[in-house]
């Protein structure tokens, strides 16, 4: 059971020491409590709740009130956990809007907020940092931009796009981001970015060389019998119970057993 409160300093220390970071999404108190007890290092209250909780076909309809409610639920269940909350679609289109939404999520129990996007977020991230709000950046596949991207596709496969993603990662780190999620990029790009950043990188479909891994809880529990993303694994089938599934996930991320090349993109 997690008895010591995790902080961003904990995650930064893990990167320096080469200890892999395990993280999962959660949306309620019971699952947040259980996964924290089984060694998961931090929790993301993801706007993926639009898909897996609300049954929508994207994250776009998720509201700030939705995120506040689920962040409060997660915090009640996991008082010592490091909790990151997603900022919903079009709630950080200006720095001033971002400050208000981020403050509400922090007051709901988040330790950090996550924003999707690249260079255009530099001013916003600088402003959030100045105001004492820690930021997790998110590059690669951006679910909130799925309509622009034309679907859920691997990003950064072409050299120019890969170089641009790296440059954006460096700019966001310089602006003050303290964590970076990389989603659905080639494993080689995940490794390249991780080696050049001083902040921890958390991959989802970004290969085994990022500083940590994150999965949507429903994916790693195999809850969608019709579809399992390439980058996911059904840990419940292997573990046999929810507690063992979370424990196995944390252990296999830590040991490097997960993810394998099978779960990665070229």
UniProtKB/Swiss-Prot annotation:
Disulfide bonds: none annotated. CDD domains: KPHMT-like. Homodecamer; pentamer of dimers. This is 3-methyl-2-oxobutanoate hydroxymethyltransferase. GO terms for biological process: pantothenate biosynthetic process. It is an enzyme of class 2 (transferase). Catalyzes the reversible reaction in which hydroxymethyl group from 5,10-methylenetetrahydrofolate is transferred onto alpha-ketoisovalerate to form ketopantoate. HAMAP family: PanB (MF_00156). SUPFAM superfamilies: Phosphoenolpyruvate/pyruvate domain. It catalyses: 3-methyl-2-oxobutanoate + (6R)-5,10-methylene-5,6,7,8-tetrahydrofolate + H2O = 2-dehydropantoate + (6S)-5,6,7,8-tetrahydrofolate. GO terms for molecular function: 3-methyl-2-oxobutanoate hydroxymethyltransferase activity; magnesium ion binding. The active site is at 183 (proton acceptor). Pathway: Cofactor biosynthesis; (R)-pantothenate biosynthesis; (R)-pantoate from 3-methyl-2-oxobutanoate: step 1/2. Binds 1 Mg(2+) ion per subunit. Mg(2+) binds at residues 47, 86, 116. The keyword Transferase applies.
